[in-house]
Amino acid sequence: MPKKVIYTREEIIEKAYEMLKSEGLNQITARTLAKKLKTSPAPIYGHFDSMEVLKDELVKKAREQFLNYIIKNYTEKPFLNAGMGFVIFAREESELFRAVFLMGNSDKEIILEFKDVIFSEVEKDERFKKVEEEKKEWLFNKCWTYTHGLATLTAMGWEKNNSNDGIKNNLLDLIVFFNDVFEK
């Protein structure tokens, strides 16, 4: 008779997610997770075919949290909010940021989701409505590159000016640089 499962799938995901946030994705193994749950690895494998399946669930959950950050209103400027959310996520949830963007778990889908959020937000800005689609794509790609770089530096602890105002000023520098896109 098989042993009764003592942890639900959701409980295992929650404990693993706590580990992800504090220790990072690479620290999550069946053995380390079982130790945190005060059990053997058997209950984990009772719900997940492999640790990779569990880790995929964790990255999916981290991506959802990332998307929540980029839709918040940090300023009165919709275009700035998504970028600020990106960098604030990297600052506040550096291990989640690393799991989503720096460990090979990032794919085109998350970039497209981010792009969709940005485009829906910036459409609220009257100036953006005048910009041609080709320029919008160009602007998005440049902003993505800059913001992803700033977020990475922040998550790694290399960007020292990472207060909300510091992030805002860094991103405003980029917006000022690209301001001519809106003016043409």
List PLM regions with ranges.
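Basic, helix-initiating cap at the start of DNA-binding domains
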Residues: 1-23, 31-32, 53-56
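Alpha-helical DNA-contacting segments of helix-turn-helix folds
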Residues: 20, 53-62, 70, 97-100, ...
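HTH DNA-binding helix-turn interface
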Residues: 22-25, 38, 45-55
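Append "Primarily bacterial transcriptional regulators
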Residues: 28-35, 44
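Amphipathic alpha-helical linker/stalk segments
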Residues: 56, 60-82, 118-128
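Helical hydrophobic small-molecule/effector-binding pocket
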Residues: 79-103, 108-112, 144
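Amphipathic C-terminal alpha-helical segment
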Residues: 96-100, 144-162, 176-184
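Amphipathic alpha-helical packing segments from all-alpha helical-bundle domains
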Residues: 104-130, 134-145, 165, 169-180
